[in-house]
Swiss-Prot record:
Annotated function: Found at the monomer-monomer interface of the photosystem II (PS II) dimer, plays a role in assembly and dimerization of PSII. PSII is a light-driven water plastoquinone oxidoreductase, using light energy to abstract electrons from H(2)O, generating a proton gradient subsequently used for ATP formation.
Protein name as catalogued: Photosystem II reaction center protein T
Pfam families named among the record's database cross-references: PsbT
Keywords of the record: Chloroplast, Membrane, Photosynthesis, Photosystem II, Plastid, Thylakoid, Transmembrane, Transmembrane helix
Localisation per UniProt entry: Plastid, Chloroplast thylakoid membrane
GO biological process, one term: photosynthesis
GO cellular component: chloroplast thylakoid membrane; photosystem II reaction center
Length: 35
């Protein structure tokens, strides 16, 4: 059960960070840094 909780926490944290960066810097020019 601990693995499930840790996985969920990791995914949610990554999602929050991704959303924060995405909304902080609106993609005006398509940057291909991550992909």
């Amino acid at each position: 059960m601990e693995a499930l909780v840790y996985t969920f926490l990791l995914v949610s944290t990554l999602g929050i960070i991704f959303f924060a960066i995405f909304f902080r810097e609106p993609p005006k020019v398509p940057n291909k840094k991550i992909k």
